[in-house]
Regions:
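Secretory targeting signatures
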Residues: 1-49
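Conserved functional loop/turn residues at catalytic and ligand-binding sites
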Residues: 101
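Exported/periplasmic ABC-transporter solute-binding proteins
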Residues: 41-98, 107-111, 116, 121-123, ...
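A catalytic-pocket lid/entrance helix-loop region that shapes and gates access to the active site
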Residues: 127-128
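Short, structured active-site "lid" loops
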Residues: 104
Length: 343
């Protein structure tokens, strides 16, 4: 029998219904698989076993090279952790940390009371120092290096601007070489600690041409025969040769103020020499200082784990990178602070 047109329509309709049922069942199965898979991913993330995390860090140029090394070494054992690290100065690090823009702020100065009241939680992780610098082609370089500079000299040069020529200083009679001061434009620990060493001053009291960043300040002095400035030691010394950066000389401090650099005040030839002087307390504090990591309220999660690692296993990389280890009792105290912080 030949099917009528109505029978054809009915058969087609039945086929479509069968297909729809099959498709619906397939869709339901796929949805269930997706839900189960999603649940599995959520649990893994919560457990912290396989989920990737990114730690955001900003702040002091002083800590930047060390932080790069720490992050690279940490990733070798924790490849699931990613880092985004930027400089900008200690002021930026503190602001970013307190505002929640970053997980960790690198701060190369003391933590101010007003920052503590805003929830700043911090630990010291290593130590370095700020040194004065002059251009290596300064015509009076030999006399400057043998005489050094007292706190009073630096105050007259950087703060009062009452000395604008090296010949105006005691023991430099007959010298006629002008002085061009350079300082930092960004809110930073280096300028703060340099000002504190000179006297009861702050960064805003330091005069001269303002330049952004540690590398920028070093380059400005290198480019000016009559330039004088200051830098964190890892921007004043070449990390490969451990000698002062080409174009720079380190300005010795006349610590006993007797008008000359004595043998026990001469420790600037290499980075290793000044590091030893800092470690022994011969080079004063300030301008040596602790370097801090800051977060808002408390260290938690992957950030907490990372900072704990820095204070323990991470300390093995400190000296080779031009930083001075903190005493064991200080590291233990700081580690306890982190371990008692957050979750």
């Amino acid at each position: 029998m030949i099917p009528t047109i109505y029978q054809y329509i009915y058969m087609i309709y039945g086929g479509i219904r069968a297909i729809m049922k099959l498709v619906s069942a397939t869709v339901i199965i796929l949805v269930l698989i997706a839900v189960v898979s999603t649940c599995g991913c959520t649990n893994a993330s919560a457990d912290g076993d396989s989920a990737e995390s990114k730690i955001f860090i900003s702040g002091a140029f002083a800590l930047y090279p060390m932080m790069i090394t720490w992050s690279e070494e940490y990733q070798k054992i924790h490849p699931e952790i990613q880092f985004e690290i930027s400089g900008g100065g200690a002021g930026k690090g503190m602001t970013d940390a307190l505002s929640g823009m970053v997980d960790i702020g690198m701060v190369s100065r003391e933590i101010y009371p007003e920052e503590q009241s805003q929830g700043a939680c911090w630990v010291a992780v290593t130590k370095d120092a700020v040194v004065g610098t002059i251009n290596s082609n300064n015509p009076a370089a030999e006399k400057i290096l043998s005489r050094g500079a007292t706190k009073s000299d630096l105050e007259k040069i950087f703060v009062n601007n009452s000395v604008t020529n090296w010949g105006q200083l005691d023991g430099m009679e007959g010298v006629d070489v002008r002085i061009n001061q350079y300082s930092r434009a960004d809110a930073c620990g280096a300028a703060s600690i340099w000002a504190k060493y000179i006297g009861d001053y702050h960064q805003e009291n330091i005069g001269g041409i303002a330049v952004s960043g540690d590398p920028g300040l070093a380059e400005a002095v290198r480019a000016d025969t009559f330039g004088i400035g200051f830098n964190n030691i890892n921007y004043a010394y070449d990390p490969t040769t451990e000698l002062p950066i080409e174009g720079l000389l380190i300005l010795p401090l006349d610590l006993n103020e007797n008008g000359k650099i004595d043998s026990n005040e001469s420790f600037y030839s290499t980075r290793a020499e000044i590091m030893e002087a800092i470690a022994k307390g011969i080079y004063p504090s300030p301008p040596s200082r602790d370097l801090n990591l800051v977060t808002k309220n408390e260290f938690t999660g992957p950030t907490k784990d990372f900072v704990e690692w820095i204070l323990t296993e991470g300390q093995q990389y400190v000296t080779e990178n031009g930083y001075i280890p903190l005493p064991e009792e200080v590291l233990t105290s700081e580690l306890n602070t982190v371990m008692e912080s957050g979750i």
